[in-house]
């Protein structure tokens, strides 16, 4: 069994953050490509209804991701805290709970989506023209649901014991397999791709995209299982260690639920902003879609760094090494602020060129330039909020994490979007996310200072006793 906890215990803070964050950030970069792959390759068929079908089913796919985050992010935080407390037996119970709960939830979702496929798809926006394609996509993705949920869960869970590199490799392997298989299953033999003729292809269209996605996740799960079976991990996949009581389920779900809700709210907020933008024409909708893709680079990189440092915070909190924990959080915030500032400056200088990468329509580009600059206003500081939110998760502070998750994409953002649209119009829609991000960043700093003050008071009371 390999001891990965030395990165938490003995590495300097900069080295520990680098060791944990870089693999997570690399995984996020590949994830950006992965998120665009299905839409890109389905788009090569020239069938707009197939492309629309993939978009329609995206909220349902994000539901699988949310369930994976429920057990993965929650399990990661609970595992790292338990390791810091020296409770290795509890770590094995936590990991077993997460593994088999994820499989169970995945199986339930398989049954539900296969049985209620038609009403579910029409509820999320399928039309008569797109239903058949969306139904094909959902059928295969639903069958693979246990693997999709488990892949997301395992990629997060192993980070809890410091195996950031293993998490990165397992996730990237699955994503690369998906990207490689996409054109093979989607396109026909003889179709053109990047100016070249496809030497083979099954021509299954949108169903092929779903099959490639499932196979990629199966490969990822197999990789993690091999990691466990080779005795490289302190985590356990033994069904005999599965427990719900003893604070196990509560400890996982308290932290995992905010992460799951955040995934769902991101999907809902994207749908809502498109509904508002429809009043201003298709060019505005297209420009916002492009802006979101461009903004994905800074958000994913900053999320990757924040996600990487979460188990370090959890371990230090569990081991009562509060000075090291605060140092780790401060250093990570500074790194994200520098990263966000650099990318923001580059985007402001080359805004038109960035938007033009995605489209050559002048009207859409004009909208996109305005939208990207507005969205990037929060770029330098939003990474600080990500670090603090993941730090709350690492410390097991589910309430604070829940407040931030609900606020950024819900409680603050939705009212702002509605009010600013009514009072300012299109500019209000464009600026609403940046304003919400700035407000939530300020909230996260205040909440963190309150948590630190409480921890100091508790520590001084223990010292006096």
Question: Where do the language-model regions lie?
Answer:
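Hydrophobic/aromatic residues within transmembrane alpha-helices of membrane transport systems
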Residues: 26, 38-42, 54, 79, ...
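Short runs within selected transmembrane alpha-helices of multi-pass transporters and secretion channels
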Residues: 141-159, 167-175, 209-222, 306, ...
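Generic alpha-helical transmembrane segments of integral inner-membrane proteins
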Residues: 25, 29, 33, 37, ...
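Helix-terminus/linker motif at the lipid-water interface of multi-pass membrane proteins
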Residues: 29, 33-51, 121-128, 184-189, ...
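Transmembrane helical elements of multi-pass membrane transporters/channels
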Residues: 19-38, 140, 174, 216-220, ...
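Interfacial/gating helices of multi-pass transporter permease domains
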Residues: 42-62, 128-136, 206-207, 248-255, ...
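Short alpha-helical transmembrane segments in multi-pass integral membrane proteins
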Residues: 1-21, 79-146, 193-257, 313-378, ...
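Small-residue-rich hydrophobic transmembrane alpha-helices
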Residues: 51-111, 148-167, 287-351, 382-404
């Amino acid at each position: 069994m390999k001891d990965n906890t030395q990165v938490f215990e003995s590495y300097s803070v900069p080295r520990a953050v680098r060791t944990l964050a870089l693999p997570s950030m690399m995984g996020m970069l590949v994830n950006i490509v992965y998120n665009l792959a299905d839409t890109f390759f389905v788009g090569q068929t020239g069938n707009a209804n197939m492309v629309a079908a993939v978009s329609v089913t995206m909220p349902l796919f994000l539901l699988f991701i949310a369930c994976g985050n429920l057990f993965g992010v929650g399990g990661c935080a609970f595992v790292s805290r338990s390791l810091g407390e020296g409770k290795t037996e509890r770590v094995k119970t936590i990991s077993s709970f997460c593994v088999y709960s994820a499989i169970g939830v995945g199986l339930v979702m398989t049954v539900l989506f296969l049985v209620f496929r038609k009403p579910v798809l029409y509820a999320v926006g399928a039309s008569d023209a797109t239903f058949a394609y969306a139904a094909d996509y959902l059928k295969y993705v639903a069958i693979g649901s246990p693997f999709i949920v488990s892949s997301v869960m395992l990629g997060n869970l192993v980070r809890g014991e410091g195996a950031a590199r293993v998490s990165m490799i397992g996730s990237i392997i699955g994503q690369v397999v998906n990207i490689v298989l996409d054109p093979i299953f989607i396109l026909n033999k003889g179709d053109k791709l990047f100016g070249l003729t496809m030497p083979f292809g099954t021509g299954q269209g949108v169903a092929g995209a779903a099959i490639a996605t499932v196979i990629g996740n199966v490969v990822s799960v197999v990789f993690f299982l091999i990691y466990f079976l080779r005795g490289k991990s302190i985590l356990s996949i033994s069904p005999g260690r599965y427990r719900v009581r003893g604070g196990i389920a509560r400890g996982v779900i308290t932290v995992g639920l905010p992460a799951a809700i955040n995934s769902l709210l991101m999907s809902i907020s994207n749908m809502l902003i498109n509904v508002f933008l429809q009043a201003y024409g298709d060019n505005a909708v297209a420009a916002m879609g492009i802006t979101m893709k461009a903004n994905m680079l800074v958000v994913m990189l900053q999320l990757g760094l924040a996600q990487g440092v979460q188990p370090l915070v959890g371990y230090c909190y569990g081991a009562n090494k509060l000075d090291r924990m605060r140092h780790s959080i401060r250093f990570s915030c500074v790194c994200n602020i520098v990263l966000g500032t650099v990318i923001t400056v580059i985007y402001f200088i080359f805004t038109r060129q960035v938007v033009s990468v995605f489209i050559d329509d002048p009207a859409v580009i004009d909208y996109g330039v305005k939208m990207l600059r507005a969205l990037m206003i929060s770029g330098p500081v939003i990474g600080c909020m990500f670090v603090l939110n993941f730090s709350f998760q690492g410390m097991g502070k589910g309430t604070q994490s829940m407040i931030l998750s609900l606020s950024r994409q819900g409680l603050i953002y939705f009212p702002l979007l509605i009010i600013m649209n009514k009072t300012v119009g299109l500019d209000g829609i464009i600026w609403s996310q940046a304003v919400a991000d700035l407000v939530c960043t300020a909230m996260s700093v205040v909440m963190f200072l309150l948590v630190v003050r409480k921890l100091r008071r508790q520590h001084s009371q223990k010292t006096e006793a």
